[in-house]
Design a protein with these regions (language model features):
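Catalytic-site neighborhoods of secreted/periplasmic enzymes
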Residues: 1-100
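Active-site-proximal cap/lid insertion segments
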Residues: 54-55, 59-112, 116-214
Length: 214
């Protein structure tokens, strides 16, 4: 456990962002609800600026509320959820931008918080674990990054001629192609399978992903 090792060495393990950690069942009471998720914070880290999880709002949400955003959701990732289904979502030339401005993104928020922490603690031992979510589903990014790359210039995805042929490559791939639905990663509401997405749709997702990287 790197956080506990840092504590032994005299450092405060400061967390900015999140850690996806499955807790050791030997260390928590039987039936603890934290055992049902891998989105826990690694024991030993001190949460300085937490972006939240599926079950918990984070410091970023409080920041957005203070900035006057009026559509703050109850979970970390729902901030990027679009109230659209997949059939209308892809009819636009570019996927919609995020609800928040570039300067208010979780990336910008964490960066500023980490800089302030380092400045405050520069004369004493310190350690910073700064973990950005982006680029990562859900695939949405703030203006102007959502229009930075046109999907028409994105290469076509490499696919087999049919889903059945694709599935023959590996049993796990067969499972994913049969069970992975859009909503698990892209927050669409129609329950369709990701494997059935058109090349054009996937290219628009890739174009948005490139914007997230930028």
């Amino acid at each position: 456990n790197i956080a506990k090792e840092l504590l032994k060495a005299g450092y405060e393990p400061a967390l900015f962002g999140y850690t996806d950690t499955s807790l050791d069942p030997r260390d928590v009471p039987k039936g603890d609800k934290r055992l049902t998720t891998y989105e826990n914070v690694l024991p030993g880290f001190k949460r300085i600026a937490f972006t939240g999880s599926d079950n918990e709002k984070g410091d970023w949400h409080g920041y957005l509320e203070k900035k006057g955003y009026d559509k703050i959701p109850t979970t970390a990732y729902a901030i990027d959820e679009q109230d659209l289904n997949s059939s209308t979502y892809f009819q636009q030339e570019f996927l919609p931008p995020s609800l928040y401005k570039e300067e208010d993104s979780d990336t910008a928020f964490l960066t500023q918080e980490a800089i302030q922490y380092i400045k405050k603690n520069k004369n004493q031992p310190w350690s910073v674990f700064l973990n950005y979510l982006s680029p990562h589903p859900p695939f949405v990014v703030s203006d102007p990054f959502h229009t930075m790359y046109n999907y028409k210039s994105v290469p076509n995805p490499i696919r087999s001629e049919s889903i059945d042929q694709e599935a023959k490559q590996h049993p796990y791939l067969k499972y994913c192609l049969s069970n992975k639905r859009d909503g698990e990663n892209w927050y669409f509401n129609d329950g369709s399978y990701a494997a059935n997405m058109e090349d054009r749709q996937l290219k628009k997702i890739n174009a948005t992903y490139f914007g997230m990287m930028s």
